[in-house]
């Protein structure tokens, strides 16, 4: 028996069937319809985009339309003035304690040594030294002290010692 010719054609190279005009038009309409539907689905912003099926409650997706919960003033309101915290005032030192602090100030000592050595200070340093020396003078006047008291007392003691020596002999 001879094999049928129809079977041999189907197994071999099949000739591509040409599409009719109606089929081509239908495919073109389908392609156009698909092309129109590209992009985001309508209402995707309101729907939230991600639709994960999960248990409602804690894991519920948040609505992207809901923003910050801070209240926004709608009318003109008075300006709110913030009260500044008062700076912690330095504890009031007694004049004696303040004088001791100024006399033991390392920066003041260093600048005075530079002045004695003949160096010139910057305007800022000079004004700082002048202010500190003025404060020392004020404190010494309050306490009834002076620079010359120590020297005069030493001279007075020397004179008294001399007088005692002269009288004693």
From Swiss-Prot:
UniProt feature, compositional bias: Basic residues: 10-19, 31-40
Record's compositionally biased regions (Acidic residues): 147-159
Keywords per UniProt: GTPase activation, Ribosome biogenesis
InterPro entries found in the cross-reference section: YihI
Disordered: annotated segments: 1-100, 144-169
A GO molecular-function descriptor: GTPase activator activity
Gene Ontology biological process terms, A to Z: ribosome biogenesis
Biased composition (Basic and acidic residues): 20-30, 160-169
Listed Polar residues bias regions: 49-58
Family: Belongs to the YihI family.
Protein's job: A GTPase-activating protein (GAP) that modifies Der/EngA GTPase function. May play a role in ribosome biogenesis.
NCBIfam families, alphabetized: PRK05244.1-1 (NF003560)
Record note on quaternary structure: Interacts with Der.
Protein name, UniProt field: Der GTPase-activating protein YihI
Biological classification of the source: Bacteria, Pseudomonadati, Pseudomonadota, Gammaproteobacteria, Enterobacterales
Gene name in the database record: yihI
């Amino acid at each position: 028996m001879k094999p049928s010719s129809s079977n041999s054609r189907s197994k071999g190279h099949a000739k591509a069937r040409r599409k009719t005009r109606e089929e081509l038009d239908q495919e073109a309409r389908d392609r156009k319809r698909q092309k129109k539907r590209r992009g985001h689905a309508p209402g995707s912003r309101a729907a939230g985009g991600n639709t994960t099926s999960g248990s409602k409650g804690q894991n519920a997706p948040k609505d992207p339309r809901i923003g910050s919960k801070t209240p926004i003033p709608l009318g003109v309101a008075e300006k709110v003035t913030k009260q500044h915290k008062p700076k912690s005032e330095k504890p009031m030192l007694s004049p004696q304690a303040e004088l001791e602090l100024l006399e033991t100030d390392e920066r003041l000592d260093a600048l005075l040594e530079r002045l004695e050595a003949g160096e010139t200070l910057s305007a800022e340093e000079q004004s700082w030294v002048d202010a500190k020396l003025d404060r020392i003078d004020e404190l010494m006047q309050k306490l009834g002290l002076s620079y010359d008291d120590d020297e005069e007392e030493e001279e007075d003691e020397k004179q008294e010692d001399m007088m005692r020596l002269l009288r004693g002999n």
